[in-house]
């Protein structure tokens, strides 16, 4: 492999391609003369669009093919949305860099209404996220929640075709695709706690590839890493996946981190919440500690019941 070349495995969706192009541009800016190639590929998650994620295997659906490409030395790195990255990595691969986070909030998108509170009784809302469904149902049990799969453009088209009165998307994706004008309102973290890692881009590579790791190092954003580490640690301890409504969101003020988390029933009938504060350098420990608090408050019974049905 040429010392001056790097190959990026990426999904083919417009948002995934934006993320890969972003990393490509950053590498070219930092390392003049470097040759960066994009290797777009389809993942199982991109192909299976008629079934809710919770029923077809969850987060790993969006990364496995990219990881195989790296293990087979067809690619050097893979670029991911952090909220799609599973807890565990295949042997020989690891998460080398987490880039600076975009807006982590959820976005309310509608052509008719400005916010969830404005929706009329019995309105139809589209989202495939059990985390979002749970929190919406808790505040608005009258709403009809329908699954919504596909890339951002497909989801917006379904809204525009009248299949939904509103849809909920990650704000970061709309911002990156220059579709901010479609956002009717941002949903605060207090109203809808984001998914762990939402809005952050991660770069995975072979853990023994020192050449690539050195090239990637300048893209690391330490504050984002602390936040995402805490959120993922909570999720890991809870053994969370796509089939359980789990929210986690860390904020940093100086050296102090505040991490909020929740576990809920998919129908929104019960939500268990917690918050913890401590040094940002203890990010992983804070995540585990908050998970333990949630479990002690009754999250375990919710998780056991959900997994029993899965």
Swiss-Prot record:
- The source's superkingdom equals Bacteria
Query: What cofactor(s) does the depicted protein rely on?
Result: dipyrromethane
Show the InterPro entries listed in the entry. Answer: HemC (IPR000860), Porphobilin_deaminase_cofac_BS (IPR022419), Porphobilin_deaminase_N (IPR022417), Porphobilinogen_deaminase_C (IPR022418), Porphobilinogen_deaminase_C_sf (IPR036803)
Q: PROSITE patterns annotated for this entry?
A: PORPHOBILINOGEN_DEAM
Q: Does the keyword Transferase apply?
A: yes
GO CC annotations? cytoplasm
Record's catalysed reaction(s): 4 porphobilinogen + H2O = hydroxymethylbilane + 4 NH4(+)
Q: Name one GO biological process term.
A: protoporphyrinogen IX biosynthetic process
Q: In which pathway does it act?
A: Porphyrin-containing compound metabolism; protoporphyrin-IX biosynthesis; coproporphyrinogen-III from 5-aminolevulinate: step 2/4
Q: Which UniProt keywords apply?
A: Porphyrin biosynthesis, Transferase
According to the record, the segments passing through the membrane are: none
Cofactor binding note of this UniProt entry:
Binds 1 dipyrromethane group covalently.
In terms of PANTHER family, this protein maps to:
PORPHOBILINOGEN DEAMINASE
Subunit notes for this chain?
Monomer.
* Designated name of the protein: Porphobilinogen deaminase
């Amino acid at each position: 492999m040429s010392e001056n070349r790097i190959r990026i495995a990426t999904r083919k969706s417009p948002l995934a391609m934006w993320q890969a192009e972003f990393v490509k541009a950053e590498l070219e800016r930092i390392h003049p003369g470097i040759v960066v190639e994009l290797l777009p590929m389809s993942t199982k998650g991109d192909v299976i669009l008629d079934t809710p994620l919770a029923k077809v295997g969850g987060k790993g659906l969006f990364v496995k093919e990219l990881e195989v490409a790296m293990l087979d030395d067809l690619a050097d790195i893979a670029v991911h949305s952090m909220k799609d990255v599973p807890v565990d990595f295949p042997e020989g691969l690891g998460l080398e860099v987490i880039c600076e986070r975009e807006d982590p909030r959820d976005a309310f998108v509608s052509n008719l209404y400005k916010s969830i509170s404005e929706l009329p009784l019995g309105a139809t809302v589209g989202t495939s996220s059990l985390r979002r469904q749970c929190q919406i149902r808790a505040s608005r049990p009258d709403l009809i929640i329908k699954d919504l799969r596909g890339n951002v453009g497909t989801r917006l088209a379904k809204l525009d075709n009248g299949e939904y009165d509103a849809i909920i998307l990650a704000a970061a994706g709309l911002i990156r695709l220059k579709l901010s004008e479609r956002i009717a309102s941002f949903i605060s973290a207090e109203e809808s706690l984001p998914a762990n890692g939402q809005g952050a881009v991660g770069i995975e590579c072979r853990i023994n590839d020192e050449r690539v790791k050195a090239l990637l190092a300048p893209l690391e954003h330490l504050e984002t890493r602390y936040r995402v580490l805490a959120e993922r640690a909570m999720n890991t301890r809870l053994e969370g996946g796509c089939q359980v409504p789990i929210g986690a969101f860390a904020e940093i003020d100086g050296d102090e981190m505040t991490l909020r988390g929740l576990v809920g029933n998919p129908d929104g009938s019960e939500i268990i919440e917690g918050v913890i504060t401590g040094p940002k350098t203890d990010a992983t420990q804070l995540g585990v500690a908050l998970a333990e608090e949630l479990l002690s408050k009754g999250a375990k019974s919710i998780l056991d019941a959900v997994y029993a049905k899965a």
